[in-house]
Amino acid sequence: MKAAAKTLKPKRQEEQANFVSWRFALLCGCILLALGFLLGRVAWLQIVAPDMLVRQGDMRSLRVQEVSTSRGMITDRSGRPLAVSVPVKAIWADPKELHDAGGITLDNRWKALSDALKMPLDQLASRVNANPKGRFIYLARQVNPDMADYIRKLKLPGIHLREESRRYYPSGEVTAHLIGFTNVDSQGIEGVEKSFDKWLTGQPGERIVRKDRYGRVIEDISSTDSQAAHNLALSIDERLQALVYRELNNAVAFNKAESGSAVLVDVSTGEVLAMANSPSYNPNNFTGTAKDAMRNRAITDVFEPGSTVKPMVVMTALQRGIVNENTVLNTIPYRINGHEIKDVARYSELTLTGVLQKSSNVGVSKLALAMPSSALVETYSRFGLGKATNLGLVGERSGLYPQKQRWSDIERATFSFGYGLMVTPLQLARVYATIGSYGVYRPLSITKVDPPVPGERIFPESIVRTVVHMMESVALPGGGGVKAAIKGYRIAIKTGTAKKVGPDGRYINKYIAYTAGVAPASNPRFALVVVINDPQAGKYYGGAVSAPVFGAIMGGVLRTMNIEPDALATGEKSEFVINQGEGTGGRS
């Protein structure tokens, strides 16, 4: 028994040793397999397919930072700033970072932020809590640097600052309708800002960085330089713009008018030197301003041009040989198609100069009826009526121009004194710039151009010169535009008055007063159009309402630009032969 027990014990010990050895080997094998699997997995992830992990890691740590570039500056023709960008800050929050740090509390620092942003603390918390896992939300835009620095010093978790810019307009309401404005993202919304948005907007740069869990930059990965925006030099002369706006604004207030517009053009280049509207608005703070008040009426509003087209009627009649400059017309009122054609005052006879000076509807209508119906249509079209000026400003209208094959006599007659078509003040300014260049048509420009500017001759120079000379009589004693006269200077103008058209297409008891012309008449340098819409102070004729504004503006322009006076010397006789019939005085 003892021998058997002795042999059994070593056997068990041997079996136990074998078991331990096998188990150890199994364990080692498992470990080796695990290590092999892990090494294989690591090799797979690092060598064969690393993109996913790299992508996930980059999503957690890489950030793209925009390197902003300022919007281009807008200046007048002499470099005076009309729109500039000033540096400001945007305040933004990282909701996730903020919540991870404990969220918004009643701490004095959070109350200070609330006061700085003028936002109640509960509203601030509500905005941040709307998306607790979000990483970006604006709290305030275009914050001035001092306030932004104050907020930065609060050192609030999850609250960050970002560089941006805000547009500032030094001329304010003087150039508001022309320059327009941008939105909070520096995108052009109105005026030149919108029309030239691409030119004024640079290409932002980009910086890719790696951040740690606390948002600190630990590595610069790459960067792309920003491309600077272009500056824009306009044709506008800020001095003349201010002058035009001041006189126009005063006239609108004095005449209790609905609105007014004025456009000043350089005859030799087609450059728009001033374009103003009244009432205006402050582009630096237009909160509460009605959208309707922001439109540039000089390019968007259309009216029947009234008597301002009469010089073109006389030119057409002279060109076609219907009359000569010494012709005397019978201007007694007459009826046509059941309608009476008459003037404000009665004249039995008028020369062509008298027709313009007294603004005779009878005279120009007889000239129109003596010509083919297509004659005036062609002339008006040559001078640009019915065609957009292509100035480049968004919102410009091309007016309304008749497209008729057959015209009744009454339509032909009224067409000669500005009814049956509609134009913008800018289109009318282009007409008079062409008259001022003695029949050379040049495209208008809102940007500065270098002379000489070639043009297209659309009318014989001799005829246009003759009519310009006739137009001088309008501002002389006895003329309908005598209130536009400028001491020391000769001016060639035409006043006009037209009834307004209501929403239903019918004429209403409201009027538009015009005065358009060029100066100095001896060698025209500037063309000016003044439009006063719906004057309510008791007078509505162009000679009484818009003519004084024309004189004030053009006189200021001539003196500002140091144009030498060209008026006739005292005692020198004028060669005008105007009225050979009855009647005195004239209004238009």
PLM features: residue spans?
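Beta-lactam-recognizing serine transpeptidase/beta-lactamase-like catalytic domain environment
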Residues: 2-7, 11, 83, 211-223, ...
